[in-house]
A protein has these predicted regions:
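A short, charge-rich alpha-helical start-of-domain segment used by transcription regulators
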Residues: 1-19, 23, 29-32, 47
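Acidic, proline/glycine-rich intrinsically disordered inter-domain spacer in sigma factors
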Residues: 82-109
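Short helix-capping/turn signature of helix-turn-helix
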Residues: 13-14, 23-24, 120-127
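Arg/Lys-rich amphipathic alpha helix in sigma70-family domain 2
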Residues: 51, 61-78, 97
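Structural recognition of an alpha-helix C-terminal capping motif at a helix-to-coil junction
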Residues: 19, 33-40, 44, 50-62
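DNA-recognition helix of helix-turn-helix
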Residues: 136-161
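Short, basic, alpha-helical segments at the C-terminal edge of helix-turn-helix-like DNA-binding modules
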Residues: 159-171
């Protein structure tokens, strides 16, 4: 892989992989380490063919599983999942948007594992149902059903936590 190709791949996928890693481990430093290991493997061993996004997400998941095996512990309490968003003109808009993202991200962490994974793969990694089904060893129809149930449960969680007023119209 050429350095220029690698730089473009890094720029394109870094943020999504970081969010996905944060959803898995809940630790920003560990998430950065997992993403770095993923890109190192991509640089050293990726061969053309197939979906690069799918391949990167699978490598990241495997890196996380390897980390769990080696450390024998799982952290499931993320304080902050999203980095600062690109700054709009109004600082108040920044704060509102970041707070809303944190609330939704925290709500996602409260979902059952299979719901959380399907949402993370769908929303943040933007994988197709078939790719998610391959990762999770199920059928695409099941992925659609799980995603629908996950969105409904997330809405319920947000409403239960008194965040519902501002989310009612979005769903």
């Amino acid at each position: 892989m050429k350095n220029t190709d690698f730089e473009q791949i890094y720029k394109k996928y870094h943020k999504n992989l970081l969010v996905y890693a944060l959803s898995l481990c809940g630790d920003y430093d560990l998430a950065q380490s997992l993403v770095q290991a993923t890109f190192t493997k991509a640089y050293l061993s990726y061969k053309e063919g197939g979906s690069l996004r799918f391949w990167l997400s699978k490598v990241l998941k495997n890196e996380f599983i390897n980390h769990i095996r080696h450390s024998s512990r799982y952290v499931d309490d993320p304080d902050i999942i999203f980095e600062r968003l690109s700054a709009p003109d109004n600082p108040l808009d920044i704060l509102i948007k970041e707070e809303r993202m944190r609330e939704v991200a925290h709500g996602i962490t409260l979902l059952p594992n299979n719901y959380r994974l399907v949402l993370m793969y769908s929303i943040y990694m933007q994988l197709k149902d078939e790719e998610i089904a391959d990762i999770m060893n199920t059928r695409p129809a099941n992925i659609r059903k799980i995603r629908s149930r996950a969105r409904q449960r997330l809405k319920e969680i947000l409403i239960e936590r008194k965040w519902g007023d501002k989310y009612e119209e979005d769903w």
